[in-house]
Each structure stands twice: as C-alpha cells, then as structure tokens.
Design a protein with these regions (language model features):
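Acidic, Ser/Thr-rich intrinsically disordered and amphipathic helical segments
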Residues: 45, 50, 70, 74, ...
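RNase H-like polynucleotidyl transferase catalytic core
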Residues: 106-110, 124-145, 161-163
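Short, aromatic/basic amphipathic alpha-helical patches
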Residues: 116-126
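C-terminal anion-handling pockets and recognition modules
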Residues: 1, 8, 143-215
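A long, amphipathic alpha-helix that forms part
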Residues: 65-102
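Acidic/histidine-rich, metal-coordinating catalytic segments
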Residues: 4-6, 89-114, 140-141
C-alpha cells in the first residue's frame, strides 16, 4: 500500500497549539516567543508518500496550488520512481508492470486534480492500481498524522538554525533542502505504527456511521 497526500505548510505559526510553562519573568523574553509574519502568511504546498517498506519522496510544489498538469509531474517524479524502487519493473518497459493485480495499491483522495481525466488515464497507462477512497475521509489516511509531526519538526529546525524567511521566494530558496531532510528523518518505526492503526481507524469510522473520529 502506498499512501500519499498534499499538505500546506504555513510559516509564521506552528501547525498546532502547545501549552508551555515559563519561569517567572521569562515568559516574554524574545527567545521564548514565536514571531508572526507581518507581510501576511507564507504558505508552501508539499506532496509526499510512504509505504510499509520505505519512506517515499517529498516534492515541494514551487507553483503553489496543484492542478492536474502539476499532479501528473508529481506522479511521474514521485510515485512511478518510488514504485520502481519497491517493485522490479518489467524488462524493456518504462512503465510500472505488476505481476499480480494485488501486488500493491496507490492511495490518493478525491481532490479534483487527482480525479481529472488525464490523471486517471496516466495511472491506467502506467498500470498503477488506485484504491477507491471515500469522500471527506482524512482520518482514514495515516499520512495526515505524519504531516502534523513533520510540520512541528520543520518549524523546530527553522528556529534552531535561526531561519526567518520573509517571503515565499525565500522559503523556496533556503528551505527546500531542510524540508526534504526533515521528511527523510521521519522514521519507519513511526510510519509502521501509523499503518498498524488502520484496523482501529476503520472500526472507528464504521462505529461513527461515517462521522467524525478521534483520528
């Protein structure tokens, strides 16, 4: 199973709130405070994937939003190359050939760029089987939990290195390498734990009648 998703990283704020305790008189010292972005939020979209065997690539979307054409590039650069590292491609073929229909499944949600006709045709041509995915179900995708931890680690790395980009161009110039390094640091132990939570996730969604769950 290959899990994938896009996510937006917003600079100038953490991905989630945290409760912290400061010593008396230290609460408002500059080194204990997170700054805000004065010129408006800076956002970067990234795409990534993983399987139960490997952490896949992380791709930074320079153009901002992802449309069908950009997603085709992501599939070619990210998914096809990742699958070829996991499975042995058929000799003499530049497509992913699968010996059995159930050798693997590729998961992406129902975003318009994922379901566009040209994308569907590309996946069929490459013989990449796609998992049917229920609408509005981020709680069933374990990569969503990984995104939260990844964003926290990325923000921490920026603070540690004293990097404070003031524009999107600066983020793309200075942070691409850091983004990819932080993603690679997400260990297989954590990913395996998230994947093993799938039976509980499915049971929770069924028990909730398709409604909200803790995931």
């Amino acid at each position: 199973m290959i899990w994938s998703d896009e996510s937006t990283i917003i600079l100038g704020r953490k991905s989630r709130r945290r409760l912290c305790i400061r010593k008396k008189g230290h609460a408002f010292k500059a080194r204990h405070c997170d700054g805000t972005v004065k010129s408006g939020k800076i956002s970067i979209m990234v795409w990534a994937c993983f399987s139960g065997e490997k952490v896949g690539p992380l791709i930074v979307c320079d153009t901002g939003n992802v449309n069908a054409d950009r997603y085709l590039e992501i599939l070619e650069d990210g998914v096809v190359s990742f699958i070829n590292k996991i499975l042995q491609p058929c000799e003499g073929s530049d497509t992913v050939e699968v010996a059995a229909d159930d050798a693997f499944l590729f998961m992406h949600d129902n975003a318009p760029c994922h379901t566009a006709r040209k994308v569907t045709q590309f996946l069929k041509r490459k013989r990449i089987p796609v998992m049917k995915w229920p609408a509005q179900s981020p709680d069933l995708n374990p990569i969503e939990n990984l995104w939260t931890m990844f964003k926290d680690a990325f923000h921490k790395r920026l603070i540690e290195e004293g990097i404070k980009p003031s524009s999107r161009a600066e983020v793309l110039k200075h942070c691409k390498t850091i983004l990819k390094e932080v993603w690679r640091d997400q260990g297989m132990e954590l990913i395996t734990k998230l994947i093993k939570s799938m039976p509980r996730r499915c049971a929770a969604v069924i028990a909730a009648g398709g409604g909200y769950t803790k995931y």
